[in-house]
């Protein structure tokens, strides 16, 4: 029992995170130097994301009997994304207005260091709906894979899958090659995941060593408010959706606990993407659904980022005494409904989208972003964790709506009946 515990990735990553926190706190300079360990692990994961998405989507679509099912899955997924992310935006807006974490700070925007956020503001001006949609189309297929742009790879994979499906038996050889290649890729993922504890240790040691616990105390009310809101969203909103779909949210969280710990250590939901594709398929969701919903959700279903965007924007307004009436807040909500959909497709993710939104609304000082620049790194964990759980739940819901979910396999896996059956066979 003890040996299996020590060998489990869950225990190893958890231990690594704890050691990283201690090192960063007591030896901050040494902790800050551990950054390359976390960066290297995330780069290894990003290296494999494009081929994983390509193989999963192509084999999923090419193996389907009807192409109408693919279109139906995509439409249902986008509808779900829009509804749930809107709920997340509204919840963030309501909570920040009730708690008012920025009230009483009385910060003069003129005293803030605008240079600190100048890079983000400049990048935000380059972002727009048209630019985002145009960016989905790659200049070249090789460029899409080289840059690791998820949506570009997804677009090419969908087109490739459709074309391969139309070939019928003539394309069987290509299908078999891609399926075999997929098995090799997942073998590489298993090797990379053995390094997850080292990556989590390095990333956490750097975070604590670089920013220190003192940063948390200064703006702690916003951080606590945000974390509690994310927990409530997962338990209440996603929990209700899960219950209506026929599974328990806590059992699902237990099922993906290793992926959650990897995300917690690296602050990047992308680090768990390859394993999520595999795990959601083992949970009973058809490969074609998993291949479409998970990668698309990384740009269109960022629940944690949605909560962060509304809370951060209103917090800046409260801290700088920039009054926001109901009209301003509705305008903010409408702008975020559009701008939040490209959060994962831009460098700097949520922070740049926040800068773009504040610039578009025009009522808030862009320099106010400097207030949360220092604590943004600490809030990224909750964003990434909520995003991961949200995309997992979305996959199950969409799979059930389009009747591509094996509910018996879902319940057996979440209730550990499969592992219990294997144990019984071994003992007998």
UniProtKB/Swiss-Prot annotation:
Keyword Transport: yes
Family membership: Belongs to the dicarboxylate/amino acid:cation symporter (DAACS) (TC 2.A.23) family.
Main location: membrane
Native source species: Cronobacter sakazakii (strain ATCC BAA-894)
Entry's localization field: Cell inner membrane
Keywords: Cell inner membrane, Cell membrane, Membrane, Symport, Transmembrane, Transmembrane helix, Transport
Record-level Gene Ontology MF annotations: fumarate transmembrane transporter activity; malate:proton symporter activity; succinate transmembrane transporter activity
Protein's membrane topology: Multi-pass membrane protein
The protein's name: C4-dicarboxylate transport protein
Domain of life of the organism encoding this protein: Bacteria
